[in-house]
UniProtKB/Swiss-Prot annotation:
Belongs to the CoA-transferase III family. Frc subfamily. The gene is frc. InterPro entries: CoA-transferase_III_domain, CoA-Trfase_fam_III, CoA-Trfase_III_dom3_sf, CoA-Trfase_III_dom_1_sf, Formyl_CoA_transfer. This is Formyl-CoA:oxalate CoA-transferase. The keyword Transferase applies. It catalyses: formyl-CoA + oxalate = oxalyl-CoA + formate. GO terms for biological process: oxalate catabolic process. It comes from the Bacteria. Homodimer. Keywords: Transferase.
Length: 424
């Protein structure tokens, strides 16, 4: 079955996480992604957090499925010729270099347009134009500057970064959408364009409800926040709210049976107004359905600590899965805190392709996250990540149509890596 992006060729000049997240998603959808890597070392993540000796790390393999790898020294004159040929033959170039790197390599936007006016150049930067645009950004820096850290954690504690990679992977996902949009636009315009996503912007986009709350503060306290019920005044910025729900429906993480020894024996429980009476019945407080102190959402807001304390008394008598089984038939929204071990052992996730087992020639089998986006007519298969330079000759011959003598000249120039010494 043909894939959605069959026929789209992508020159992948990305490394670490943000860019590879983008290009891997496009590869899953069928694009031919050619990953350009530095001879000898390749993407730095090949050797980072290595768990199996002499094998690519999971950090690399889980972000570079379905790609081809070519090693290339772009500073070498022959290497620059190869790169120019790749630019001519590709539809998209994706890069997440520091600002100015492509220009210094001789591939400014103006020069790229001369080489291939239909090429889409997609870039990830830390910040957009402004006082910080030349600063280097990593995952946690993006979270801190994009509004996530200042609004995550508890009111009386430090700002916190989230375990989800919203800065790196979140930006990569935004860029993938931008690339597909630019490809569609090209069908009308016939021209390439630049697509740029800043990590700060991506994090802020995912924190839009906190910007919503920032503006609501001008009109009074945020009544769904715990501190309102505790009588604590609000400041002039959106506060950290612990595990309060961000959608206007009060919610908390509550202890379940076994919490004393199991760090994940918890459940997230939402006191949605539509099912309040069912909640009262489930926890054994039927009088709360008519008591004016509890019956209406507005009356409950100053009493959320008391209410969730009572619900927790009930959840502590059940496992998190028992709570789910009891609440789901009543449409009471709740969800267990699942550990990565529990998720990795969930067979239903393998059935849907959300988790996949991948075999690798040097590290053996490992579990990876598959494509979270399911297309009915373009199912994604997950193939292993490439070894360093595995497809170099294939790309030179089959994609760029270089002759054997041309490939030999390129190799002997050192553009593909260290030149083997002649036998004595």
């Amino acid at each position: 079955m043909a894939k959605a992006l069959n026929g789209v060729r992508i020159l992948d000049f990305t490394h670490v996480q943000s860019g590879p997240t983008c290009t891997q998603l496009l590869a899953w959808f069928g694009a031919d992604v050619i990953k350009v890597e530095r001879p000898g070392t390749g993407d730095i993540t090949r050797g980072q957090l290595q768990d199996v000796p002499n094998a690519d790390s999971l950090y690399f393999t889980m972000l570079n499925h379905n790609k081809r790898s070519i090693t290339l020294d772009a500073k070498n004159p022959k290497g620059k010729e190869v790169l120019t040929a790749l630019i001519k033959s590709c539809d998209v170039m994706v890069e997440n270099f520091a600002p100015g790197v492509l220009d210094r390599m001789g591939f400014s936007w103006e020069n790229i347009q001369k080489i291939n006016p239909k090429l889409i150049v997609a870039s990830i930067k830390g910040f957009g134009p402004g006082p910080f645009e030349d600063c280097k950004v990593y995952e946690n820096v993006a979270q801190c500057t994009g509004g996530s850290a200042s609004t995550t954690g508890f009111r009386d504690g430090l700002p916190l970064v989230t375990g989800a990679q919203i800065g790196d992977s979140g930006t990569g996902l935004h860029l993938a959408l931008g690339i597909v949009t630019a490809l569609f636009h090209r069908t009308h315009s016939g021209k390439g364009q630049r697509v740029t996503v800043a990590m700060q912007d991506s994090v802020l986009n995912l924190c839009r409800v906190k910007m919503r709350d920032q503006q609501r503060l001008a009109h009074g306290p945020l009544k769904e926040y715990s501190q309102f019920g505790e009588g604590i005044p609000f400041g002039d910025a959106t506060p950290r709210a612990g595990n309060d729900s961000g959608g206007g429906q009060p919610g908390r993480i509550l202890k379940c049976k076994g919490w004393e020894t199991d760090p994940n024996a918890y459940i997230y429980f939402i006191t949605q107004a539509a099912v309040w009476e069912k909640i009262c019945d489930v926890i054994g407080e039927p009088t709360w359905k008519t008591d004016p102190n509890y019956a209406k959402p507005g009356a409950r807001l100053p009493r959320l600590n008391e209410i969730f304390g009572r619900i927790e008394q009930w959840t502590m008598t059940k496992t998190k899965f028992e709570v789910m089984n009891i609440c789901n038939p009543f449409d009471i929204p709740c969800g267990p805190i699942l550990s990565m071990k529990e998720i990795a052992e969930d067979k239903s996730l393998y059935a849907t392709g959300t988790l996949v087992e991948v075999d690798h020639p040097t590290r053996g089998k490992y579990i990876s996250v598959g494509n979270p986006i399911k297309l009915s007519d373009s199912p994604a298969d997950v193939r292993r990540s490439p070894l360093l330079g595995e497809h170099t000759d294939e790309i030179l011959r089959d994609v760029l149509k270089f002759s054997e003598s041309q490939v030999s000249d390129i190799r002997s120039s050192g553009a593909l890596g260290e030149v083997p010494l002649a036998a004595e």
